[in-house]
Regions:
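N-terminal, charge-rich interaction modules
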Residues: 2-86, 165
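Structural motif
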Residues: 59-60, 111-113, 133-134
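Short His-Asn-centered micro-motif
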Residues: 63, 114-117, 137
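Structural alpha-beta junctions
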Residues: 83-95, 130-132
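Short, flexible, solvent-exposed loop/turn segments with mixed acidic/basic and small polar residues
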Residues: 95-106
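Short cationic amphipathic helices and targeting signals
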Residues: 106-116
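Helix-rich interaction surfaces within compact, conserved domain-sized segments
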Residues: 121-140, 146, 150
């Protein structure tokens, strides 16, 4: 079986289990570009700086990179990212370039911060692009991780992680 690089930067033979993946996503760092400045947001933390800059009622970080958390290669990731961007631009939603990276600063995935998107539409975007999880939060509340699966027995007990299945 081929080796793959996980969000934790380690080489593995299989994608991480969902519980492990949730821990990695929750520990990751996320950035949105507004103007010429990057703003940090993280699971379980307030994103007041982002909210001050963008003034939306809700926020979603979504990417099309590495569907099902399996490395897809740069060409396939860029192609999927273009499809996601086109889909988002066809809506009336405001979007800003964003990225996520593991806690060590590697394993970067490019995506979008989508403004004023509802839970259902946000979850549909995640599923349509094969994402195991996305970030979602309402203004004034901490950033939440939304995993697109039922909660497995090995999942962390985290008050900022929602299991949608």
């Amino acid at each position: 079986m081929p080796m793959i690089r996980a969000m934790d930067g380690e080489l593995e033979q299989t994608p991480p289990a969902l519980g492990d993946l949730a821990r990695l996503y929750a520990a990751a760092h996320y950035f949105v570009v507004v103007g010429r400045k990057e703003w940090l947001f993280q699971v379980g933390q307030s994103a007041a700086d982002v909210e001050r800059q963008l003034g939306a009622g809700s926020y979603q970080f979504v990417t099309a990179w590495n569907p099902r958390s399996c490395p897809a290669g740069e060409a396939r990731n860029l192609e999927a990212a273009q499809v996601l961007e086109q889909r988002l631009r066809e809506t009336s939603l405001s979007i800003h370039r964003a990225l996520g990276c593991n806690a060590q600063g590697g394993a970067v995935e490019h995506g979008w911060l989508v403004l004023d998107v509802g839970w259902d539409q946000a979850d549909a975007l995640a599923r349509d692009f094969g994402q195991a999880g996305t970030l979602y939060w309402l203004a004034g509340e901490p950033v939440r991780l939304r995993m697109q699966a039922p909660r497995p027995h090995d999942a962390p007990d985290d008050m900022f992680t929602d299991w949608t299945g």
